[in-house]
Amino acid sequence: MMNESSTEKKNELSLSFAALGVVFGDIGTSPLYAFGQVIKYFPINDHNIYGILSLIFWSLIIIVSIKYLVIVFRADNDGEGGIIALAGLIRQKIKKPGGWLLFITLVGIGLIIGDGILTPAISILSAVEGLESLSPNLAKYVLPVTLIILFFLFKMQSIGTGKIGIYFAPVMLIWFITIGVLGFLQIIQNPKVLMAINPYYAIYFFMIHKYFALFILGGVFLVMTGGEALFADLGHFGKKAIRTGWFAVALPALLLCYFGQGAFVLMHIEYIKYPFFSLSPDWFLPVMIILATIATIIASQAIISAAFSILKQASLLNLIPRLKIIYTSKFEKGEVYLPLINFILALGTCSLVVIFKSSSNLADAYGIAVNLDMLITTVLVGIIAYYCWNWHAFKVMIFPLILVIELAFFAGNIPKLLTGGWIPILIAFLGFVVMYTWHCGFEKLRELHHRDALMDAFIIDELNQNKISRQSGMGLYIIDPYDCEGESLLHHLRLNRIFFENMIFVSIKIENKPYIPIEDKFELIKKAEGFYLIFIHYGFTENINLPNELDEMFKRVYLPFEIIKNKLIYFIEIVFVEMTRERQKHMYMWQKHLFSLMIRNAVPDIQFYRLPYNKTIAIGTYYQL
């Protein structure tokens, strides 16, 4: 028993260590720009610095430590976190939640795309700006160096991070130790800053500055950016590992660093442009700049990987068009590369760097997307607490209280809309338009399909009565997502009168759970003699490889005929959309054009399901929108 307990502790510690290189990268590099962004609006004096530090301290405690690590962590979907996991959890309990859940989910995914564009830009730019602390003459190199780093960062996505990923955790541990020590060295010179732990100073700050103090919350919020990643990465490391990493390493280091910056600016009012790099002795500054740059690259890698992961899940759930998914690791199933998304993120990130030119300017655009994502998380977890956990209404009242705090931060972020905050909102809006148009287009395809498929029921009767001649062999038909039970392919068979002696229709069902156990994966329905419908159930985080899945299926599902894999022929459907001027419900003409463009360029079934090219036949189906 002692050995087992010791082994478990070692595993937890190793997971906590690994989490440092992924989970805490974003929030761990916030000290580069967050504190400097806040203090530029106020005169440097004891009351202002103590008030700002008190707001930072209690924000990290209430929102990140209590809300996320204590409350939100309870809302895991079979160990998985993130907005899609939360939405899936609600759908398991509320079978028909209505359009509001779809709306929130699509907005949340759009915000994650915006975050994936903004985070690499502000993080790496803020690190490279350390060159100015070395010499003002180096300022002209900040932009080109940042762009070069970003170019190689996005270029390396196609080969994955498997080989260098093992170094992420050690680097981030060194980073946290370094910023913690540098902050501590300043605190011991001015220990009075520790009085800011008292919430009185945060309250007094509001009493002095009144409504203007609300504006400063937009800057204070920057210390929490990356906090949402703690929940999003839950499936990779687990609750205990992330909690241990946060409370043992990340949180103490961050607080020491922020309080150290506060102590420093009170003693050196003239060094307020880059208070973070001012903590470093001159002899250590070049090392600090290199370490900060590497840390921000790791933080950026984490958010890019998270964007790939969430959009892969959205693609499986048919919330967005099917994307080309490349698996970059044979061992880590979660490591994926999405070429189109990588190009969009790279283009957006580099454009923002060129347009805004400094991390201070970019900070105005940053934060709003994360703030909205946190608000959405609070709402969804509140619903889960009431409907899934059966919390009493009195206990659920904690969520409105958290919402009030987060809405106060959002109010502080609103003025940023005029100076760049509109960018993540625009990105999220464009993402929402694309996803909602895809949803509406598919709903229309389902409607048109069911209208035409009503007559196909008699084919089943004819097959049962042996009124239709059959040819020898077997065909395996892959059903498209808009088609529930393969009526569209049956319609094709009825037209050309080609019926195999044995036919298997395979329908892929993506469930509201991250993983489906193998014993629940397959469902067999006999439709007619020699004609079977098989449902294969996947979780929204699983990788789809249909030929491999079929091997397992044939072992577990009894069929009254022999399956010869080498002679198996796959049939897939390719949908073509012809636009008409007829006004469709919930779809304007521009949406028809957009949907037609997306369905033409979506990854075909043969790639998505990884079917063999030399044994796959495509059948075209036409619809008029």
Curated annotation (Swiss-Prot):
Pfam families, sorted: K_trans, K_trans_C
InterPro entries tied to this protein: K+_transporter (IPR003855), K_trans_C (IPR053952), K_trans_N (IPR053951), Kup (IPR023051)
UniProt GO molecular function: potassium ion transmembrane transporter activity; symporter activity
Transmembrane spans: 15-35, 52-72, 98-118, 134-154, 164-184, 203-223, 246-266, 284-304, 336-356, 365-385, 394-414, 417-437
Major subcellular site: membrane
Compartment annotation: Cell inner membrane
Topology in the lipid bilayer: Multi-pass membrane protein
Assigned GO CC terms: plasma membrane
Signal peptide: none
Family, as annotated: Belongs to the HAK/KUP transporter (TC 2.A.72) family.
Functional note: Transport of potassium into the cell. Likely operates as a K(+):H(+) symporter.
Official protein name in the record: Probable potassium transport system protein Kup 2
Gene: kup2
